[in-house]
Regions:
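Acidic/polar residues at beta-strand termini and the immediately following turn/coil
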Residues: 1, 8, 55-59, 105
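Loop-centered beta-sheet repeat module
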Residues: 1-25
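Alpha-helical solenoid scaffolds that mediate protein-protein interactions
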Residues: 3, 27, 46, 53-56, ...
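Short, flexible helix-adjacent loops and helix caps
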Residues: 8, 32-36, 58, 83-84, ...
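Short, solvent-exposed segments of well-ordered alpha helices
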Residues: 11-15, 36-40, 62, 111
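Oxyanion-binding "anion nests"
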Residues: 19-60
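CBM-like carbohydrate-recognition segments
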Residues: 60-145
Length: 145
Protein backbone atom coordinates (compact mmCIF):
# COMPACT_ATOMS: atom_id res chain seq x y z
CA UNK A 1 0.00 0.00 0.00
CA UNK A 2 2.90 2.37 0.68
CA UNK A 3 4.24 1.86 -2.83
CA UNK A 4 0.80 2.43 -4.35
CA UNK A 5 0.45 5.70 -2.44
CA UNK A 6 3.87 6.82 -3.68
CA UNK A 7 2.86 5.97 -7.23
CA UNK A 8 -0.34 7.98 -6.81
CA UNK A 9 1.66 11.01 -5.70
CA UNK A 10 4.40 10.75 -8.31
CA UNK A 11 3.18 9.73 -11.78
CA UNK A 12 6.74 9.24 -13.06
CA UNK A 13 7.07 6.26 -10.69
CA UNK A 14 4.22 4.54 -12.52
CA UNK A 15 5.91 5.10 -15.88
CA UNK A 16 9.24 3.87 -14.51
CA UNK A 17 7.57 0.73 -13.17
CA UNK A 18 6.02 0.03 -16.60
CA UNK A 19 9.42 0.26 -18.28
CA UNK A 20 10.99 -1.83 -15.51
CA UNK A 21 8.41 -4.58 -16.13
CA UNK A 22 9.09 -4.31 -19.88
CA UNK A 23 12.81 -4.76 -19.30
CA UNK A 24 12.17 -7.78 -17.10
CA UNK A 25 9.92 -9.57 -19.60
CA UNK A 26 12.24 -8.74 -22.52
CA UNK A 27 15.20 -10.13 -20.56
CA UNK A 28 13.26 -13.27 -19.67
CA UNK A 29 12.52 -13.88 -23.35
CA UNK A 30 16.23 -13.93 -24.20
CA UNK A 31 17.46 -16.00 -21.26
CA UNK A 32 18.84 -19.50 -21.70
CA UNK A 33 17.16 -22.39 -19.91
CA UNK A 34 20.16 -23.26 -17.65
CA UNK A 35 19.54 -19.99 -15.82
CA UNK A 36 16.28 -21.32 -14.38
CA UNK A 37 16.71 -19.89 -10.85
CA UNK A 38 17.47 -16.43 -12.19
CA UNK A 39 14.55 -16.68 -14.63
CA UNK A 40 12.16 -17.55 -11.78
CA UNK A 41 13.41 -14.61 -9.72
CA UNK A 42 12.88 -12.24 -12.64
CA UNK A 43 9.41 -13.72 -13.09
CA UNK A 44 8.63 -12.98 -9.42
CA UNK A 45 9.75 -9.36 -9.85
CA UNK A 46 7.76 -9.11 -13.08
CA UNK A 47 4.56 -10.43 -11.48
CA UNK A 48 4.96 -8.08 -8.52
CA UNK A 49 5.43 -5.12 -10.86
CA UNK A 50 2.37 -6.02 -12.95
CA UNK A 51 0.29 -6.47 -9.80
CA UNK A 52 1.28 -2.99 -8.63
CA UNK A 53 0.65 -1.51 -12.06
CA UNK A 54 -2.84 -2.97 -12.23
CA UNK A 55 -3.88 -1.93 -8.75
CA UNK A 56 -6.99 0.16 -9.29
CA UNK A 57 -5.80 3.20 -7.35
CA UNK A 58 -2.49 3.44 -9.18
CA UNK A 59 -3.91 2.83 -12.65
CA UNK A 60 -6.86 5.24 -12.36
CA UNK A 61 -4.64 8.30 -12.15
CA UNK A 62 -2.53 7.59 -15.23
CA UNK A 63 -3.30 9.97 -18.08
CA UNK A 64 -0.35 9.16 -20.34
CA UNK A 65 -1.48 7.07 -23.31
CA UNK A 66 2.10 6.03 -24.06
CA UNK A 67 2.31 4.38 -20.65
CA UNK A 68 -1.02 2.63 -21.23
CA UNK A 69 0.19 1.34 -24.60
CA UNK A 70 3.43 0.09 -23.08
CA UNK A 71 1.56 -1.57 -20.22
CA UNK A 72 -0.57 -3.48 -22.74
CA UNK A 73 2.66 -4.69 -24.38
CA UNK A 74 4.11 -5.75 -21.02
CA UNK A 75 1.01 -7.75 -20.08
CA UNK A 76 0.45 -9.34 -23.49
CA UNK A 77 4.07 -10.43 -23.74
CA UNK A 78 3.85 -11.89 -20.24
CA UNK A 79 0.75 -13.83 -21.27
CA UNK A 80 2.42 -15.15 -24.41
CA UNK A 81 5.47 -16.27 -22.45
CA UNK A 82 3.27 -17.88 -19.78
CA UNK A 83 4.70 -15.59 -17.09
CA UNK A 84 1.10 -14.47 -16.45
CA UNK A 85 -2.17 -16.37 -16.68
CA UNK A 86 -3.66 -15.48 -20.04
CA UNK A 87 -7.22 -16.05 -18.83
CA UNK A 88 -6.75 -13.50 -16.06
CA UNK A 89 -4.66 -10.78 -17.68
CA UNK A 90 -5.15 -10.77 -21.44
CA UNK A 91 -8.54 -9.05 -21.37
CA UNK A 92 -7.10 -6.21 -19.27
CA UNK A 93 -4.28 -5.67 -21.76
CA UNK A 94 -6.61 -5.85 -24.76
CA UNK A 95 -8.91 -3.26 -23.14
CA UNK A 96 -5.93 -0.95 -22.66
CA UNK A 97 -4.86 -1.48 -26.25
CA UNK A 98 -8.37 -0.79 -27.53
CA UNK A 99 -8.40 2.49 -25.57
CA UNK A 100 -5.10 3.43 -27.18
CA UNK A 101 -6.32 2.69 -30.71
CA UNK A 102 -9.65 4.39 -30.04
CA UNK A 103 -7.79 7.57 -29.13
CA UNK A 104 -5.67 7.27 -32.28
CA UNK A 105 -8.77 6.84 -34.44
CA UNK A 106 -10.88 9.58 -32.85
CA UNK A 107 -8.39 12.32 -32.07
CA UNK A 108 -7.30 14.38 -35.03
CA UNK A 109 -3.79 15.11 -33.82
CA UNK A 110 -0.19 14.15 -34.37
CA UNK A 111 1.25 11.54 -32.03
CA UNK A 112 4.89 11.39 -31.02
CA UNK A 113 7.17 8.52 -31.99
CA UNK A 114 7.27 7.16 -28.44
CA UNK A 115 3.49 6.77 -28.38
CA UNK A 116 3.31 5.16 -31.82
CA UNK A 117 6.15 2.76 -30.97
CA UNK A 118 4.47 1.69 -27.71
CA UNK A 119 1.18 1.14 -29.54
CA UNK A 120 2.98 -0.91 -32.21
CA UNK A 121 4.68 -3.02 -29.53
CA UNK A 122 1.33 -3.73 -27.89
CA UNK A 123 -0.35 -4.53 -31.19
CA UNK A 124 2.46 -6.87 -32.26
CA UNK A 125 2.17 -8.84 -29.01
CA UNK A 126 -1.60 -9.02 -29.44
CA UNK A 127 -1.05 -10.53 -32.92
CA UNK A 128 1.56 -12.96 -31.60
CA UNK A 129 -0.80 -14.06 -28.82
CA UNK A 130 -3.50 -14.78 -31.40
CA UNK A 131 -1.06 -16.82 -33.49
CA UNK A 132 0.07 -18.89 -30.50
CA UNK A 133 -3.48 -19.54 -29.38
CA UNK A 134 -4.63 -20.48 -32.89
CA UNK A 135 -1.65 -22.79 -33.28
CA UNK A 136 -2.52 -24.46 -30.00
CA UNK A 137 -6.13 -25.01 -31.05
CA UNK A 138 -5.03 -26.77 -34.24
CA UNK A 139 -2.62 -28.98 -32.30
CA UNK A 140 -5.11 -30.16 -29.69
CA UNK A 141 -4.27 -27.33 -27.31
CA UNK A 142 -0.52 -27.97 -27.21
CA UNK A 143 1.22 -24.64 -27.77
CA UNK A 144 4.88 -25.62 -27.82
CA UNK A 145 5.03 -28.94 -29.70
Amino acid sequence: DKIIKKIELDKSLYENLVYYAASLIDTMELMAQPLYEIYRKLQEYYKAAVTLLLSSKAQENVQDKTVEAMLSYVILKGCRMKALQTEKYESVAVDLLEKVFHSINTQNQTFDAKYVAAAAFGYSEWIRNREYQDYGINKGGVLWS
